[in-house]
UniProtKB/Swiss-Prot annotation:
Subunit annotation: Part of the 50S ribosomal subunit. Contacts protein L32.
Species for this entry: Nautilia profundicola (strain ATCC BAA-1463 / DSM 18972 / AmH)
Gene this protein is translated from: rplQ
MF (Gene Ontology): structural constituent of ribosome
Entry protein name: Large ribosomal subunit protein bL17
Similarity annotation: Belongs to the bacterial ribosomal protein bL17 family.
Amino acid sequence: MRHKHGYRKLGRVSEHRQALLRNLACDLIENGRIETTVPKAKELRKYVEKLITKSKNADLNTHRYVYSKLGSNERAKAATRKVIEEIAPKFENRKGGYTRIIKTRFRRGDAAEMCIIEFVGE
């Protein structure tokens, strides 16, 4: 039984799952929209929306928190800057629901359900 289980394992061990979410989050922040499978998109939505909610209060601790969640490299540094300076102010009056998931197709090869995840208002 999976009662009260809070996240999807996505067929990966914990470090691999965290790396996947960091990379997907950086891609989404850089591009505004990405195509991925539905379970990955649903996990990514939780991950990114927490970052945006935290980023609304733009102080040094917020910068450090977001940077730690996105990894510690130049790509994460640019994504952190974009979240805090561009994306979070755009959603300042919204209390949640910063992303939308649009189901698109079934992937040829393994028939995985694909979707586009994007920020609302783009």
